[in-house]
Swiss-Prot record:
The chain crosses the membrane at residues 163-183. It comes from Bos taurus (Bovine). Phosphorylated on tyrosine residues upon stimulation with pervanadate and concanavalin-A (ConA). Phosphorylation at Tyr-241 and Tyr-263 is required for interaction with PTPN11/SHP-2. Dephosphorylated by PTPN11/SHP-2 (in vitro). N-glycosylated. Belongs to the myelin P0 protein family. Residues 203-213 have a biased composition (Polar residues). The lineage of its organism: Eukaryota, Metazoa, Chordata, Craniata, Vertebrata. InterPro entries: Ig-like_dom, Ig-like_dom_sf, Ig-like_fold, Ig_sub, Ig_V-set, Myelin_P0-rel. This is Myelin protein zero-like protein 1. Disulfide bonds join C58-C135. One of its GO terms (cellular component) is plasma membrane. It is a single-pass type I membrane protein. It is found in: Membrane.
Length: 269
């Protein structure tokens, strides 16, 4: 007996579902494959004088070029609270300011997405603006991002630091590293000089070299007389008389032979 046509469709439906889920999983994997991390850079803290404009600098780095999908959001966490309020959004060249009273009509766009800049300006900053500011950037497919945090302090003009804290820290660090390098180089030079003095085994000519008394040059007749004056009873092998050059010139290694050499046989009695 043949099975109804509808039964075959019901039997095949689980296989079709498994196939559909496999296709969806593969598509999701392709979509998430191109997702990469986006890096945001902000100063850790800044000081702004009361009643003046403050610039919140935010830079980012992305492997993809910016476009219409790139967006920037700024949030604020008031000092002493855990509540975060979004007060500014920028996308497709448009500014979307929130209705949060402390920032109403105060915030303006100061960045350039083509230059990876997401900075903003806040006019007439007051003490109520003390807190932490959060910069969040999305640049699909770079959507995995660690937002940047800025700790902002509004202070009186009289106590405003001459330089930002991060600048002072950088200068101090550079000075310390420079001094350390200089001291290390000086110590290395001193150490090498001391070792070279210890390894040197030379002597002072004026102190350790005693003068050598040169022997007067003998004439041939004097040499013959010396031979004749020896006792006649002894026996000795050939005797060679030579004269050395003690002049100390450039060619001191050359041996200068005497003008005459006398051989004598002396026999013992």
């Amino acid at each position: 007996m043949a099975a109804p046509a509808g039964a075959g469709a019901l039997i095949a439906s689980p296989d079709r579902r498994r196939c559909l889920w496999s296709v969806l999983a593969a598509a999701l994997g392709l979509l998430t494959y191109g997702v990469s991390a986006l890096e945001v850079y902000t100063p850790k803290e800044i000081f702004v004088a009361n009643g003046t404009q403050g610039k919140l600098t935010c830079k980012f780095k992305s492997t993809n070029t910016t476009g219409t999908l790139t967006s920037v959001s700024w949030s604020f966490q008031p000092e002493g609270t855990d509540t975060t309020v979004s007060f500014f959004h920028y996308s497709q060249g448009q500014v979307y300011a929130g209705n949060y009273p402390p920032f109403k009509d105060r915030v303006s766009w100061a960045g350039d997405l083509d230059k990876k800049d997401a900075s903003i300006n806040i006019e007439n900053m007051q003490f109520i603006h003390n807190g932490t500011y959060i910069c969040d950037v999305k640049n699909p497919p770079d959507i995995v991002v660690q937002p940047g945090h800025i700790r902002l302090y509004v202070v009186e003009k009289e106590i405003l630091p001459a330089f930002p804290v991060w600048v002072v820290v950088g200068i101090v660090t550079a000075v310390v590293l420079g001094l350390t390098l200089l001291i290390t180089m000086i110590l290395a030079v001193i150490y090498r000089r001391r070792n070279s003095k210890r390894d040197y085994a030379g002597c002072n000519t004026s102190e350790n070299v005693s003068p050598v008394k040169q022997v007067s040059r003998k004439s041939p007749s004097d040499t013959e007389g010396l031979v004749k004056s020896l006792p006649s009873g002894s026996h000795q092998g050939p005797v060679i008389y030579a004269q050395l050059d003690h002049s100390g010139g450039h060619h001191s290694d050359r041996i200068n032979k005497s003008e005459s050499v006398v051989y004598a046989d002396i026999r013992k009695n």
